[in-house]
Curated annotation (Swiss-Prot):
Pfam families in the cross-refs: DUF150_C (PF17384), RimP_N (PF02576)
GO biological process: ribosomal small subunit assembly; translation
Any one cellular-component term (Gene Ontology): cytosol
Protein name stated in the entry: Ribosome maturation factor RimP
Location of this chain's protein in the cell: Cytoplasm
Protein's job: Required for maturation of 30S ribosomal subunits.
Main location: cytoplasm
Gene coding for it: rimP
Keyword terms: Cytoplasm, Ribosome biogenesis
Entry similarity comment: Belongs to the RimP family.
Length: 150
């Protein structure tokens, strides 16, 4: 089965399982790596953080589906994880959800901003550091992620 077809079938079932468990799918990847084929499913909790138990329960259900359907022709490793503490920010919903959190935003023109997300309104992200506030149009963002705080 082609990789795109595998991804489509896995994503559909992953979304069903995630919805049942009150989770969301952040990403699904299927690719060959140095140790062989890896099916990586990254889950998210829309109202908090992903626990080890969340990963365990999701993984069990996904394994049942994969064993039952048996549509992946070669051996692979299933990995289920969270987006991580330094998770990428993907779109308006994330900027609203993580208001108050420390983030790093790199714009398409190469500027880097590190500060707390203050708000997201009408396509504009407001982020501030100790010295000043910055307003960044979401269309100008090349990449963004949360910064780990200690």
């Amino acid at each position: 089965m082609f990789e795109e077809m595998i991804l489509e079938k896995v994503r559909k079932e992953a979304e069903r399982i995630a919805e049942e468990q009150g989770l969301e799918i952040f990403d699904v990847q299927y690719r060959r790596e140095s140790r062989g084929w890896v099916l990586r499913i990254i889950i998210d909790n829309p109202v908090g953080y992903v626990s080890v138990r969340d990963c365990e329960l999701f993984s069990r259900e996904m394994e049942r589906f994969l064993d039952r359907e048996d549509f992946i022709e070669h051996s692979y490793t299933l990995e289920v994880s969270s987006p991580g503490l330094d998770r990428p920010l993907r779109g308006p919903r994330d900027y609203v959800r993580f208001t108050g959190k420390l983030a790093k935003i790199v714009t398409k023109d190469g500027k880097t901003f590190i500060g707390r997300i203050e708000s997201f309104v009408d396509g504009t992200i407001t982020i501030s550091d100790e010295k000043r506030k910055y307003e960044i149009n979401i269309d100008d963002v090349k990449r963004a992620n949360l910064e780990v705080e200690f």
